């Protein structure tokens, strides 16, 4: 019997309190009785098995016996959770066989067009956590070079099919999605209660922030519970015609969540990958009609009208193939929408609009009404062109606020702290003039530096928008934080680049013309 054929020594599982994102990581002692240098090395892939249950992980080697002993196998939190066995359970560890679908990834890198079967195999292996982050990155980079229309359709279909697939016993199920990048912009939390109050079905699932100071789910969580199950979601929609929940908890298109976790650090955001991400989730969600908000601006994800047109054609192409009526609308992406950036501040804006507060941000109110109007006109009983008037009626009558409260009551109370950060700092204008530009990316960075979205009361409140006159020393915005170090970091970053451009009135007029 060769050493390779000998029975493998068993190791006891030990939980290591280490958050490794979405990647499965195992840790083994260099003195482990199961470690053979000719087989195992750092960052190799291993299969951990107990009877018929197994999980693949990336292996790290340690010399610290206090972390993992010679008779133990450490599992970081994600791997421990997925394996689902208690600490102390005996397991075997063996070299992992690379997924067959990696051959297709190599082919894509070399410029080959993949078949639908190959793309399906890749997505299936992704969702079974058979790929390391490096292997996922290889697939993303290969796909970023080029993707045919058939490959795009195959990717959308495969991603939609591996998670939860919702079906609704209603002829029209509307949805709205913004491609993101604009601070504030919490239109979904206003248009969902408007549309639901009208009687259309709008089961809205949203994401948490990844690189922004707040996602819709983070902001809604200030007001209500968002981590509901599929069964609870269906009950909420039956009672309210709509919901505002975190999509990650109902497991729509889990492959997309995995891909996004690797895309963002690599700054990969191609049109095809963006469309595949959005459309796979809408297909899985059972949407029949989709409105896509495309903000256009110099620091938005879409920089020009030409880019917006190309993206529109791609959304419509995929929608036509899968039987989803897709409408895109280009909106102003030159500056934030609303006055708040950060979960609590954005929730305050939303409730001010729904409550018809005279001080509510007019830009957020108007954009929400405009988007809601498009969705309402999917109702065949509503006269064409009457959507805006109906949306305004539902908002001004208080029906939308009442519907929002009903949604909040059905989703359950929030357990989040709603206080604003107690440490503040105002960023002021350096000269007299007119605000001519606002850098959305920089304001997002500053709000995150201040602690958002982890600290829901951290962020930025804006006092000035593009076109507003300012005097030297007048506040442009206020930073909110809880942690003194985060406040100081945000203030220092704002001194280097505050995100505002102030020009004299004549220069501003020339730019506008």
Swiss-Prot record:
Task: Look at the named UniProt entry and state the broad enzyme category this protein falls under.
Answer: transferase
User: What EC number(s) would the UniProt record show?
Assistant: 2.4.2.4
Q: Which SUPFAM superfamilies match?
A: Nucleoside phosphorylase/phosphoribosyltransferase catalytic domain, Nucleoside phosphorylase/phosphoribosyltransferase N-terminal domain, Pyrimidine nucleoside phosphorylase C-terminal domain
* GO process annotations (BP): pyrimidine nucleobase metabolic process; pyrimidine nucleoside metabolic process
Question: Its GO CC terms?
Answer: cytosol
What this protein catalyses is: thymidine + phosphate = 2-deoxy-alpha-D-ribose 1-phosphate + thymine
UniProt entry tagged with the keyword Aminoacyl-tRNA synthetase: no
* Keyword Glycosyltransferase recorded: yes
Q: Which InterPro entries match?
A: Glycosyl_Trfase_fam3, Glycosyl_Trfase_fam3_N_dom, Glycosyl_Trfase_fam3_N_dom_sf, Nuc_phospho_transferase, PYNP-like_C_sf, PYNP_C, Pyrmidine_PPase_CS, Thym_Pase_Put
Keywords for this entry? Glycosyltransferase, Transferase
Q: Could you give a GO molecular-function term held by this entry?
A: 1,4-alpha-oligoglucan phosphorylase activity
Q: Which domain of life is it from?
A: Bacteria
Q: Which family does it belong to?
A: Belongs to the thymidine/pyrimidine-nucleoside phosphorylase family. Type 2 subfamily.
Name assigned to this protein: Putative thymidine phosphorylase
């Amino acid at each position: 019997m060769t050493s390779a054929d000998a029975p493998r020594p068993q190791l006891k599982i030990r939980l290591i309190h280490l958050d490794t994102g979405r990647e499965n990581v195992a840790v083994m002692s260099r003195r482990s009785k199961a470690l053979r240098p000719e087989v195992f090395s750092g960052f190799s892939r291993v299969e951990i098995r107990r009877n018929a249950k197994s999980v693949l992980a990336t292996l790290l080697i340690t010399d610290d016996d206090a972390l993992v002993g010679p008779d133990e196998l450490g599992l970081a939190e994600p791997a421990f959770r997925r394996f689902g066995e208690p600490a102390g359970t005996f397991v075997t560890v063996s070299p992992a066989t690379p997924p067959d679908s990696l051959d297709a990834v190599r082919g894509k890198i070399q410029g080959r067009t993949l078949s639908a079967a190959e793309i399906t195999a890749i997505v299936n292996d992704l969702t079974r956590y058979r790929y390391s982050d490096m292997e996922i990155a290889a697939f993303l980079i290969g796909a970023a070079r080029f993707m045919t229309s058939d490959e795009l359709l195959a990717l959308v279909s495969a991603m939609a099919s591996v998670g939860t697939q919702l079906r609704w016993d209603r002829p029209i199920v509307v949805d709205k999605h913004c491609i993101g990048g604009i601070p504030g912009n919490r239109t979904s939390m206003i248009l969902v209660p408007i549309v639901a109050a009208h009687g259309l079905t709008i089961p809205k699932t949203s994401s948490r922030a990844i690189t922004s100071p707040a996602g819709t789910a983070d902001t809604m969580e200030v007001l209500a519970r968002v981590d509901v199950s599929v069964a609870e979601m269906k009950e909420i929609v039956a009672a309210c015609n709509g919901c505002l929940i975190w999509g990650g908890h109902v497991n729509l298109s889990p492959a997309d969540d995995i891909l996004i976790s690797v895309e963002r650090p690599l700054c990969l955001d191609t049109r095809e990958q963006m469309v595949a991400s959005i459309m796979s989730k809408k297909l899985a969600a059972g949407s029949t009609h989709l409105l896509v908000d495309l903000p256009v601006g110099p620091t938005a994800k879409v920089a020009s009208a030409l880019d917006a047109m190309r993206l529109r054609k791609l959304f419509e192409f995929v929608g036509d193939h899968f039987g989803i009526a897709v409408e895109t609308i280009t909106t102003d992406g030159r500056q934030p929408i609303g006055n708040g950036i950060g979960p609590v501040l954005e929730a305050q804006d939303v409730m001010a609009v729904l409550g018809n507060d005279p001080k509510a941000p007019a830009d957020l109110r108007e954009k929400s009404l405009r988007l809601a109007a498009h969705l309402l006109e999917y109702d065949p009983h509503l006269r064409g062109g009457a959507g805006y008037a109906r949306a305004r009626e539902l908002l001004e009558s208080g029906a939308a606020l009442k519907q929002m409260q009903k949604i909040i009551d059905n989703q359950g109370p929030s357990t989040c702290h709603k206080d604003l950060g107690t440490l503040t700092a105002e960023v002021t204008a350096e000269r007299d003039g007119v605000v001519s530009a606002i850098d959305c990316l920089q304001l997002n960075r500053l709000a995150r530096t201040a602690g958002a979205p982890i600290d829901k009361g951290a962020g930025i409140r804006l006092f000035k928008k593009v076109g507003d006159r300012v005097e030297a020393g007048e506040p442009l915005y206020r930073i909110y934080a809880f942690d003194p170090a985060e406040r100081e970091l945000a203030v220092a970053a704002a001194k280097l680049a505050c995100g505002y451009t102030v020009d004299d009135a004549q220069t501003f007029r020339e730019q506008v013309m």
